[in-house]
Regions:
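A long, amphipathic alpha-helix that forms part
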Residues: 3-45, 107
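Long, internal low-complexity/basic segments
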Residues: 1-13, 21, 25, 193-211, ...
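Short beta-strand segments
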Residues: 46-51, 78-79, 136-142, 164-165
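Histidine-centered active-site microenvironments of extracellular/periplasmic hydrolases
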Residues: 34-87, 96, 117
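Beta-strand elements within well-structured catalytic alpha/beta cores of enzymes
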Residues: 18, 22-25, 29, 46-51, ...
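C-terminal, low-complexity/hydrophilic appendages and adjacent surface loops
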Residues: 70-73, 143-227
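Active-site rim elements
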Residues: 7-20, 64, 84-95, 107-112, ...
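Polar, surface-exposed loop/tail segments
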Residues: 42-45, 87-156, 231-241, 253
Length: 253
């Protein structure tokens, strides 16, 4: 196979492997839920089904994760707790994985330590509007240079808009000297060693590039609105919000 046929063959194999993993997870979760039911533990158990991120399956021409587009940025979250959450209820508020620990402490009647980020999700369980809940989220990917060669970028997401800034110096060594300690037996070890052996240097240029998306109108994020007529006010507001996050989180540019 060559050309398009080879690409399609690789993609189909990739999808099949991915779906097999999903089926395995589904089966294992089902076994766990069955055990809880059989031992009458379901009503007194908090079940959280989530992930560390979403995943690309060809969207935007990508696989894997890392970029701030919705397919990776938007993560699954299902919580079952019969004592406090009505079955089939939904919540559209913005939450983060850093909210999990405060939530578990809150449900256990324990106070969140001052140093711990995040907010308890318990106020959202009733399905009622919650005052003073967050209206935006911040994202930052900074692991460049690395063998993924995904450029540094950060951004903010509100209910309607998303601003992404790709930034940083290019032309750097993909595997800086002594940055990585290769662990024998790991799947990534061969890649680090290979890049070191060929003294790999990226040909990426310096970058300072914005992307702006209207999530309501363009949920697939296919049309970059940055610099388009009529978007100046939104750009200004989103840039201001990004600057606030960077300052509060002490982000190095």
């Amino acid at each position: 196979l060559t050309g398009k046929e080879l690409v399609e063959w690789k993609y189909q194999n990739y999808i099949c492997d991915y779906m097999a993993v999903i089926a395995s997870v589904d089966e294992s979760v089902g076994r766990l839920l069955t055990y809880l039911d059989e031992h009458h533990l379901t009503d007194n158990t908090i079940i959280v089904y989530t992930s560390d991120q979403g995943f690309y399956m060809g969207e935007h021409g990508w696989f894997d994760k890392r970029f701030m587009y919705e397919e990776s940025f938007h993560t699954p979250l299902i919580i079952s707790y019969p004592k406090h959450i009505q079955p089939k209820s939904e919540c559209n508020q913005m939450v983060q994985n850093i909210d999990f620990a405060p939530t578990f402490l809150d449900l256990a009647g324990l106070k969140k330590p001052a140093y711990m980020p995040g907010t308890s999700l318990q106020p959202l369980f009733a399905g009622q509007p919650v005052r003073k809940w967050r209206k935006s989220l911040y994202y930052h990917y900074y692991d460049y240079p690395n063998y993924h060669l995904v450029r540094k970028h950060d951004g903010v997401r509100t209910e309607r808009y998303k601003l992404i800034l790709f930034y940083g110096k290019g032309g750097e060594r993909a595997v800086p000297e002594n940055k990585y300690q290769c662990q024998p037996g790991t799947s990534e070890n061969w890649c680090f060693e290979y890049l070191k052996s060929i003294n790999y240097i990226t040909d990426d240029a310096d970058i300072d590039y914005y992307e702006l998306y209207d999530i309501q109108v363009d949920p697939n994020e296919l049309h970059n609105l940055y610099g388009k007529p009529g978007m100046q006010k939104v750009e200004k507001e989103m840039k201001k919000l990004l600057a606030i996050y960077r300052r509060n989180l002490k982000v190095d540019e």
